[in-house]
Structure formats: structure tokens, C-alpha cells
Design a protein with these regions (language model features):
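The feature captures the catalytic groove of carbohydrate-active enzymes
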Residues: 1-49, 53-117
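Non-catalytic C-terminal accessory modules of carbohydrate-active enzymes
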Residues: 46, 126-239
Length: 239
């Protein structure tokens, strides 16, 4: 059976809406800065500060837990920089603990793209790689075990017996794991303050689960390649 014994996680729309309100405002502030629109940058930066304060008041408990206490909640709060500095590490630990507890992803359309990024950024690479390599439902590799050659809309669009279940068989959403593969596994990341990958940082997150990783990103300034492999004496990284 593809069924999990997990009853389901629900992150309410008020939490998600506020998180994305903050993220949208953050992007506007960044765009204004890049375009040299100082008045707009200041306006959106001040709005972002107020949104963060309201978010923390409404959704962060006194002991640092989030309400709702779901993987998606922790992923969005950490990815969008919505938590006070002093509780971020603990929040990331709670996320990692939840992943370990259930052994699989419980995020939906909005939390899935960033969960492995957040885990890796806070030192929980083992949990991120665990999610990548899991072959039982729900996971990225379960579809491969039943012959998938595309990314599906739902984790179980085809059941183990080969019957069609639900959803599109060619859908972009879960392909978001590709960002983590490029930016954390291969380690190709844009430097802070840079635009269009003019300046880059190469910082792979190594694992004993892989013997090598290789990726190339074609930026407007030219191709950026990272290749690491395990050897008898350690690791080799070619950039």
C-alpha cells in the first residue's frame, strides 16, 4: 500500500497568507533597492517589519513553537526570515525532529519547494537527504519505483499495482527539489547582494549517501559548473 499512517497536516490560510504577504513585501523592497528607488525600498522595508511583528505575535508561542505546529509552518517561517534570531535554531530542530518522527514529507504545494533548503541551511543535511532518497510514498523517488519518467502532480498518481489514481502525470510542482540539488548538493549559489549570478558562492553540502555530484547552471554571464566526488583520500571539488 502507498498509504501512510500520518493523518495529515493542515496549515491554516491565515498563517500561509501572512507568510506570503511578508515574502511578497520583502521581494518588493529588494527590487526597489536594485532599481535605486530608495523611497519605495524604505516604504516596503518598514511594512515588512510591521508584518513580521504581527506574525510573531499571532503565530509564535512564548516558548518558541509555531502555531500551527506543522512542517510547512516551520519551513515558511524559516525560509522567509520571519522568526527572531534567538529561536531560529530551535525552530529548525523542531522541523528536523518532525521529519524524523514521521520519516517523510508532510508539506503541501507551498511548503515542499523549500523544506530541503531549510533543513540544509540549518545543518540538518541528513534529514534533507533522507527525504530525497526515500522510496516509499510520499516521496520524490516513489514515482520512479513504478516507472515514472516525469514529475507528477500528486505523490501517488499511479498506485503500486500500476493503476491510475489522480492528478496530472506531468506537473512542475514537486520538481522544486531541483533548486536544492543545484544550490545545496552541487553547491551553486548566488552571492548575497549579487544579481543574475554575476557573483557566486560554491558550497556543496556533502553526504556519504552520494559518491559524486555534478551540475551546470547556465547564467547570463556564462556556464557555472560544480563537480565533487569521493576519492580514496577524501573529496575532490572541481569548479
Amino acid at each position: 500500500s502507498t498509504a501512510s499512517d500520518y493523518p495529515g497536516a493542515f496549515t491554516d490560510k491565515e498563517f500561509v497568507g501572512t507568510a506570503y504577504f511578508a515574502r511578497s513585501t520583502q521581494l518588493l523592497a529588494q527590487a526597489a533597492q536594485i532599481l535605486g528607488k530608495e523611497e519605495d525600498r524604505k516604504t516596503y522595508s518598514e511594512l515588512l517589519s510591521r508584518i513580521k511583528q504581527s506574525f510573531q505575535k499571532e503565530f509564535v508561542t512564548r516558548n518558541g513553537r509555531l502555531s500551527p505546529n506543522t512542517q510547512t509552518a516551520y519551513v515558511l517561517a524559516l525560509s522567509f526570515d520571519l522568526l527572531p534570531e534567538d529561536i531560529r535554531k530551535d525552530a529548525a530542530q523542531r522541523l528536523a525532529d518532525d521529519v524524523r518522527k514521521f520519516g517523510h514529507i508532510t508539506t503541501g504545494f507551498l511548503g515542499t519547494p523549500e523544506i530541503c533548503n531549510v533543513l540544509s541551511d540549518y545543518g540538518h543535511d541528513d534529514e534533507a537527504y533522507m527525504l530525497l532518497f526515500r522510496k516509499k510514498f510520499p516521496s520524490w523517488l516513489y514515482p520512479v519505483t513504478v516507472g515514472a519518467t516525469t514529475v507528477w502532480e500528486s505523490w501517488d498518481a499511479i498506485l503500486p499495482d500500476g493503476t491510475f489514481n489522480k492528478g496530472s502525470l506531468n506537473h512542475f510542482a514537486y520538481g522544486a527539489i531541483g533548486d536544492w540539488l543545484f544550490s545545496r548538493v552541487a553547491g551553486i549559489r548566488q552571492a548575497e547582494g549579487s544579481t543574475a549570478y554575476k557573483e557566486i558562492v560554491i558550497k556543496p553540502h556533502f553526504t556519504t549517501s552520494l559518491s559524486f555530484a555534478r551540475a551546470t547552471y547556465y547564467s547570463m554571464y556564462g556556464p557555472i559548473s560544480s563537480h565533487w566526488q569521493r576519492t580514496d583520500t577524501g573529496l575532490e571539488l572541481h569548479v
